[in-house]
Amino acid sequence: MAEAQYIPRLKVQYLEKFRPELTEKFSYKNLLEVPRLDKIVLNMGVGEAVGDSKKIKSAFEDLQAIAGQKPVITKAKTSIATFKLREGMPIGVKVTLRKDRMYEFLDRLVTVALPRVRDFRGLNAKSFDGRGNYAMGLKEHIVFPEIDYDKVDQIWGMDIIVCTTAKTDDEARELLRKFNFPFTK
């Protein structure tokens, strides 16, 4: 007997509820025109790694726990003498989430992590790039439940970029609103 295939909660909601609503609102003629999530990129810039390489390892492990997959260590493209930075030195970690992991991360971000942010008043609705992609930043990575607060040696900030197939910012904003992104009015 075949096992039931697991599908993330937000993906099911998108396919069954959000896509028909968006089709009706923007009067799309084809289902492939409807905006959908393409990928989510998580980036941690670790500037202190120039002096101490152990900090990259710590950020690497934390991002791996948050994303659920192995991050890539980013290296400096050029040397900058004022920062004592040489070309090729590790200065950050990033990971790209797609498919089911992307929906799972988005679910955890909206339902668990963002409500745990101190003094949170909503996300800036103007942080779109003009092509339907949304960028936001978190000052503390400890808002994610996968990170044990007692075992963290340093608190890192992180960038979160949500890439969609939307042609305009209005379409992307409406799509992310359906996913319960808490935009300010």
Curated annotation (Swiss-Prot):
SUPFAM superfamilies: RL5-like. Pfam families: Ribosomal_L5, Ribosomal_L5_C. One of its GO terms (biological process) is translation. The keyword Protein biosynthesis does not apply. It comes from the Bacteria. One of its GO terms (molecular function) is rRNA binding. InterPro entries: Ribosomal_uL5, Ribosomal_uL5_bac-type, Ribosomal_uL5_C, Ribosomal_uL5_CS, Ribosomal_uL5_dom_sf, Ribosomal_uL5_N. Keywords: Ribonucleoprotein, Ribosomal protein, RNA-binding, rRNA-binding, tRNA-binding. The keyword Ribonucleoprotein applies. GO terms for cellular component: ribonucleoprotein complex; ribosome. Part of the 50S ribosomal subunit; part of the 5S rRNA/L5/L18/L25 subcomplex. Contacts the 5S rRNA and the P site tRNA. Forms a bridge to the 30S subunit in the 70S ribosome. This is one of the proteins that bind and probably mediate the attachment of the 5S RNA into the large ribosomal subunit, where it forms part of the central protuberance. In the 70S ribosome it contacts protein S13 of the 30S subunit (bridge B1b), connecting the 2 subunits; this bridge is implicated in subunit movement. Contacts the P site tRNA; the 5S rRNA and some of its associated proteins might help stabilize positioning of ribosome-bound tRNAs. Belongs to the universal ribosomal protein uL5 family. This is Large ribosomal subunit protein uL5. The gene is rplE.
